[in-house]
Swiss-Prot record:
The keyword Lipid metabolism applies. Keywords: Acetylation, ATP-binding, Cholesterol biosynthesis, Cholesterol metabolism, Cytoplasm, Lipid biosynthesis, Lipid metabolism, Lyase, Nucleotide-binding, Steroid biosynthesis, Steroid metabolism, Sterol biosynthesis, Sterol metabolism. This is Diphosphomevalonate decarboxylase. It comes from the Eukaryota. GO terms for biological process: cholesterol biosynthetic process; isopentenyl diphosphate biosynthetic process, mevalonate pathway; positive regulation of cell population proliferation. It is an enzyme of class 4 (lyase). (R)-5-diphosphomevalonate binds at residues 24-27, 79, 157-162, 213. The gene is Mvd. Catalyzes the ATP dependent decarboxylation of (R)-5-diphosphomevalonate to form isopentenyl diphosphate (IPP). Functions in the mevalonate (MVA) pathway leading to isopentenyl diphosphate (IPP), a key precursor for the biosynthesis of isoprenoids and sterol synthesis. The modification N-acetylalanine is found at residue 2.
Length: 401
C-alpha cells in the first residue's frame, strides 16, 4: 500500500452509495452540517455502485490537490477543507495521546487526492455521500485515525456518514450543539435481509438544476410542512422503519418508504419558490409501481426518489424479473436494448396480458435510460493491490480516469 519512499504514504479505498428510506432534508447548523431530523438508509453493493479514492501524502508535495473523475477541482472548496481539517485534528489528537511519535509521517505534508465514481455524478445518485465517505475513510487509513468517522464525513456531506457502514444505517440527528452525538450507526448488517433487491431506474444522468445544499436551506427557511415533518412525523417513522427492517416486514418497509419519499417531495413543493426534482417520467414510474402493486393484491414493489428524477426501487428477489419486464413494457429501450439492464443478472420473463392491461400505460420509449440491479452491500473497503492506485509515484493521476 505504501509508496517507495518510507516517509510517504498512498492508500486506496472504495465506499458505497446509500439510499435513504427515511429522508434527510434540512440542517439546523450549516457549518457543522447537523440535520433537523434523523434519517435511515440502505447501503448499496459496491459491485455495482462505488467511489474509489486514492490519497497520497509526501514531503515533496507543495500544495493540497484533488482530482474528481479525472478533472482537477478547487481544493479550497469549504467542505473539502472542513474534512481535511477535521481528520488532521483527529490525527494530531491521536499522536499527542500516544507514547512517542509512532506515526511514520508528518502532519505537515500536503495531500493529493484522486477520486472516481462508476456512476453519474450529481444526478440524484448520492454521489457526494459516497465521495466524502470514501475521502474520510481513506484519509483515516493514511493518518492512522481510528474510531467513528461520522464527524469527518458529515462535514463534507451530511448523508456521507451513512455510507461509512454497510447494511441498514441510522444517522442520529443528535441534540448537542457541537454535533458530537450526531453520528451514524448500523442497525442491521448487509447480510440481514438477503432477499432484498434494489433497482435504480436512471431517468436522467444530467446535473440537477437545484443542488441539495441550496434546496434544503430554502426549505428550512420557507416550508412549514418541513418543520412539522421533522418534529412530528419522522421520530415515529424512524422507530417503525427500524422495526420493519429488523422483522423483514417488506409490506411495512415498502409502504413507509414510498410515503416518506412522497412527503419529502411534498416539502420541496411547499418550499418557496417551489422545488421540483421529479419529472414526467418519475411520475409515470410512481404510477407504474402503484398499478403493479394493485394488480398483485399486495405491496411487492416500492419507489423512493432523492433530490433528482431517478427512481430507486425496492423489491424482493422473486419479484425482480416481473417488475423489470413491466418497466421494459412501459419504457421500451430506445436503443442498445442489451445494455438496458446493468448489474445483477435478471432472467427475462414475459408479462401476462392481465398485467399489461392492469398497467394501462402509454409506452414512453427511452423514458428510462437504463436500470442498475443491485443488492444491499458492505461499508468502505481498503484495496491492497497497488495497481488499484489512481495516483502514480509522482502523486499525479496515472491513467485516464
Amino acid at each position: 500500500m505504501a509508496s517507495e519512499k518510507p516517509q510517504d504514504l498512498m492508500v486506496t479505498c472504495t465506499a458505497p452509495v446509500n439510499i435513504a428510506v427515511i429522508k434527510y432534508w434540512g440542517k439546523r447548523d450549516e457549518a457543522l452540517i447537523l440535520p433537523i431530523n434523523s434519517s435511515l438508509s440502505v447501503t448499496l453493493h459496491q459491485d455495482q455502485l462505488k467511489t474509489t479514492t486514492t490519497v497520497a501524502i509526501s514531503k515533496d508535495f507543495t500544495e493540497d490537490r484533488i482530482w474528481l473523475n479525472g478533472r482537477e477541482e478547487d481544493v479550497g472548496q469549504p467542505r473539502l477543507q472542513a474534512c481535511l481539517r477535521e481528520i488532521r485534528r483527529l490525527a494530531r489528537k491521536r499522536r499527542s495521546t500516544e507514547d512517542g511519535d509512532t506515526l511514520p509521517l508528518s502532519l505537515s505534508y500536503k495531500v493529493h487526492v484522486a477520486s472516481v465514481n462508476n456512476f453519474p455524478t450529481a444526478a440524484g445518485l448520492a454521489s457526494s455521500a459516497a465521495g466524502y465517505a470514501c475521502l474520510a475513510y481513506t484519509l483515516a487509513q493514511v493518518y492512522g485515525v481510528e474510531g467513528d468517522l461520522s464527524e469527518v464525513a458529515r462535514r463534507g456531506s451530511g448523508s456521507a456518514c451513512r455510507s461509512l457502514y454497510g447494511g441498514f444505517v441510522e444517522w442520529q440527528m443528535g441534540e448537542q450543539a457541537d454535533g458530537k452525538d450526531s453520528i451514524a450507526r448500523q442497525i442491521a448488517p448487509e447480510w440481514h435481509w438477503p432477499q432484498l433487491r434494489i433497482l435504480i431506474l436512471v431517468v436522467s444522468a444530467d446535473k440537477k438544476q437545484t443542488g441539495s445544499t441550496v434546496g434544503m436551506q430554502t426549505s428550512v427557511e420557507t416550508s412549514t410542512l418541513l418543520k412539522f415533518r421533522a418534529e412530528s412525523v419522522v421520530p415515529e417513522r424512524m422507530k417503525e422503519m427500524t422495526r420493519c427492517i429488523q422483522e423483514q416486514d417488506f409490506q411495512g418497509f415498502a409502504q413507509l418508504t414510498m410515503k416518506d419519499s412522497n412527503q419529502f417531495h411534498a416539502t420541496c413543493l411547499d418550499t418557496f419558490p417551489p422545488i421540483s426534482y421529479l419529472n414526467d417520467t418519475s411520475r409515470r414510474i410512481i404510477q407504474l409501481v402503484h398499478r403493479f402493486n394493485t394488480h398483485q393484491g399486495q405491496t411487492k414493489v416500492a419507489y423512493t426518489f432523492d433530490a433528482g428524477p431517478n427512481a430507486v426501487i425496492f423489491t424482493l428477489e422473486d419479484t425482480v424479473a416481473e417488475f423489470v419486464a413491466a418497466v421494459r413494457h412501459s419504457f421500451p429501450p430506445a436503443a442498445n436494448g442489451d445494455k438496458f439492464l446493468k448489474g445483477l443478472q435478471v432472467a427475462p420473463v414475459l408479462l401476462s396480458d392481465e398485467l399489461k392491461a392492469a398497467l394501462a400505460v402509454e409506452p414512453s420509449p427511452g423514458g428510462v435510460q437504463y436500470i442498475i440491479a443491485t443488492q444491499v452491500g458492505p461499508g468502505p473497503q481498503v484495496l491492497d493491490d497497488t495497481h488499484d492506485h489512481l495516483l502514480g509515484q509522482d502523486g499525479l493521476p496515472q491513467r485516464d480516469l
